[in-house]
Amino acid sequence: MELTFASYNIHKAVGLDGRRDPDRIISVLREVDADIIALQEADRRFGARASVLPRALLDDTRWRPLPVAKRPRSLGWHGNALLVRRDIKCLHAEPLDLPTLEPRGAVLAELDLRGEHIRVLGAHLDLSGLRRRDQIKAILKQCTRRGKMPTVIMGDFNQWGRLTGAMQAFGMGWQQITPGASYPSARPIARFDRIIATPDWSYETSGVHHSATSAAASDHLPVWASLRTA
């Protein structure tokens, strides 16, 4: 079974022109056309933490959001949301608290794809770097708690080095896929956005989605990877 996973920090749908334009984000998602998508900064930061992507817009797409929000108007938890193809069955979904000096979290879901069960997580890690390693360890602890399953972790790791610093917390048992430079979208130099997979997956291909729309829609470009269950 081959699936395309994507991670996209949508910057609260505010583009490089300073306009909040959720339609533009939806257009980028359609261009990428992944099966499973992790979004970061999908909710406003203050007040009711309302989603920046109206449900009516999502209803017009091939994806549905998974129930990981703690607030009724939010799409995700601390801005982390998961979208999946409508034919994918959700077995379990939950928000995760992470050790932090600033508001950060992750989201976890277990899915049924025609009898094959997989786990996906979305995360947006600490900007300062002071708790990033602890946050990765907390995510891995939650995976252990839920039991062994083919797993993919996606998100904005805010880490410059591919195998340095906090990324060393993953150890040898994880495939670290860094599709390419995705930040800032106008002239990408940083590889903050990554996809991490257990050895259950066979890596096929990956990339950074760069188009006229994606270059303007957010300060990050979306990244994607095609993986096949081994």
Predicted regions and their residues:
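Active-site regions of metal-assisted phosphoester/phosphodiester hydrolases
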Residues: 1-36, 44, 48, 64-230
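Glycosyltransferases and closely related glycan-assembly transferases
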Residues: 53-62
